[in-house]
Amino acid sequence: MPPDRLEGVALVTGGGRGIGASIARELTEAGMRVAVTGRTAEQVNAVADDIEGLALLGDVASADDVGSWVEATERELGPIELLVANAGMGAGDSASWDMPVDDWWRVQEVNVLGVHLSTRSVIPLMLDRGRGRIVITGSGSAYLPGTRSTAYATSKAAVCRYGETLANELAGRIAVFHFSPGLVRTEMTQRFDDDLPWTPPELAPQLVRVLASGRADALAGRYIHAEHDDIEDLIARAGEIAADDLNSIRLRR
């Protein structure tokens, strides 16, 4: 199947580097006008220049900054059709009891509060217009047992549940997706060993492109993995997936 062609405006938080930058480029190639956000001017401006998009600076954990991003995007580019809540941070390898409390909490502010501030800023606008989609970048840390980084694992587990609950709240009005990009080589993961099962970097942007198209709306609220799931297969089996409650994180007894 040829790649989906898209239109409209997308806001990609954390779009100045890594997975976010790749998503911004993919959406631009698909036909969308894209605004990218971040804290490092050099990175954000470079991506915005590359895609002929809009660069927005600030902190995703600041309600004022996020609100200004949404206002600027709608003023400069038009109504936001797609939010990609991608901004996030890692937590290093410090033992949980050695990690300063403020550092531990900062991970929650960026990875959890940042997602909430982003979604709550666009949802009223999308509801008023009767259209829109939200894609939240998660992690396998939401469900895989780990041996380090309680800060990161906690934040991603929270975002996973947040995404599913939000999808249920908005069912039939706005499609909300939560996906894992896999283990992608980025600035955040550069300290990891080379022999780990790295995910091809193009898979996450390609998945987001499909989610933005509307073809996968029946999968809203489901957990989707960029590498381990075949999105076209999931779309074809959407009825079965809903009936059997697949692609979900549950307590089984």
Question: What kind of feature is each model-predicted range?
Answer:
Residues 14-18:
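Conserved glycine-rich cofactor-binding loop
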Residues 57-69, 101:
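The beta1-alpha1 cofactor-binding region of Rossmann-like NAD(H)/NADP(H)-dependent oxidoreductases
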Residues 90-105, 148-151:
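Conserved mid-core segment of classical short-chain dehydrogenase/reductases
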Residues 97-116, 131, 135, 159:
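Catalytic Tyr-X3-Lys loop
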Residues 119, 155:
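Active-site helix of classical SDR
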Residues 124, 168-169:
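Alpha-helical segment proximal to the catalytic Tyr-Lys
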Residues 139:
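Residue(s) in the substrate-gating loop at a strand-loop-helix junction
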Residues 178-179, 194-253:
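C-terminal helical subdomain
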